[in-house]
Amino acid sequence: MKIYAVLLCLLLIAVPVSPEKLTGPDKAPVTCCFHVLKLKIPLRVLKSYERINNIQCPMEAVVFQTKQGMSLCVDPTQKWVSEYMEILDQKSQILQP
């Protein structure tokens, strides 16, 4: 039951911190974050991440993908974010053949 409460809170908070698709000069879609989530996300709900550092975006960010398919923008300078990225990298290396 706790996990559902956490996910509901994340969903309500994620609306303003989910990545936006913009169109670049070559008409290719560009993912940008305009706001970042301030609270720590439980590692157990995360599946993967993507770094956002496109020059067309207003801020550098990391987008975490949850196991439920949500995308959440977070501040890459926070210590827990870099720790989670390392853990997710290790998990993905173990899963690759």
Swiss-Prot record:
GO biological process terms held by the UniProt record: calcium ion transport; cell-cell signaling; exocytosis; immune response; inflammatory response; intracellular calcium ion homeostasis; negative regulation by host of viral genome replication; positive regulation of myoblast differentiation
UniProt-listed SMART domains: SCY
Signal peptide: 1-23
GO cellular component, one term: extracellular space
Alphabetic keyword roster: Chemotaxis, Cytokine, Disulfide bond, Heparin-binding, Inflammatory response, Secreted, Signal
One Pfam family cited in the UniProt record for this chain: IL8
Superkingdom of source: Eukaryota
Positions of disulphide bridges: C32-C57, C33-C73
Keyword NAD: no
UniProt GO molecular function: chemokine activity; heparin binding; phospholipase activator activity; protein kinase activity
Stored InterPro entries: Chemokine_b/g/d, Chemokine_CC_CS, Chemokine_IL8-like_dom, Interleukin_8-like_sf
Subcellular location: Secreted
Family indicated by similarity: Belongs to the intercrine beta (chemokine CC) family.
Assembly behavior: Monomer or homodimer; in equilibrium.
Its biological purpose: Chemotactic factor that attracts monocytes. This protein can bind heparin.
Protein name: C-C motif chemokine 8
Species per Swiss-Prot/TrEMBL record: Mus musculus
